[in-house]
Amino acid sequence: MYYENFFKKFIETHTENSQVICIDGVVGVGKSTLGELITKEFGINMFQEPVIDNPLLDKFYYDKKRYSFPLQIFFLNKRFQMMLEALELNSCLMDRSIYGDIIFSKMLCMDNEMTKEEYDVYEELLETMLKLVKKPKLMIYLKSSVSSAMAKIKERGRAYELEVPTEYWESLNRHYEAYFEAYNLSD
């Protein structure tokens, strides 16, 4: 119910069609792989998830309580910048987008890794930003079992992801399913 109410705030404000395609799903589901196939096939630009030059991501996995809020603000800001850049393009693809960011923040708040006050600041900022960008033309949700995603995470070999307990990935998967059951912004 939370996510349904969240989306209702933006349905009326986002009426223009755009050519933004977003791919979302849990960590390790294959968003980047699918994105590369789509961009190669259709010759469109792709915005990668900002994980390579992210100064907070590895720290977050070792100290979630300390780094959850600044990490979520970092991602929110980068994804907002990408959405603004996307307005200048005829079409583009996003490997994860500003729209799914709330999943992580909501989960962190529910798990007491982010304070309620931090979450409220985050949510208010997100709502302000979403009023300034167009909704995606298409949202692709890649659904996966936790065991399949974890196998891909192991194969990828990012040390900070390998340290994460299975319960975190299971919770993330449940939050994604709830989010996309309520998602109704794209055409």
Show where each model-derived region lies.
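Conserved lysine of the Walker
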Residues: 31
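Conserved substrate/cofactor phosphate-moiety recognition/catalytic segment
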Residues: 36, 40-78
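A glycine- and Lys/Arg-enriched "phosphate-lid" helix/loop adjacent to the NTP-binding pocket
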Residues: 104-175
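Conserved nucleotide-binding/hydrolysis micro-motifs of P-loop NTPases
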Residues: 51-53, 98-100, 144-149
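Glycine-rich phosphate-binding loop used to anchor ATP phosphates in small-molecule kinases
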Residues: 67-134
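Hydrophobic anchor at the beta1->P-loop junction of P-loop NTPases
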Residues: 23
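Extreme N-terminal, non-catalytic leader segments
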Residues: 1-19
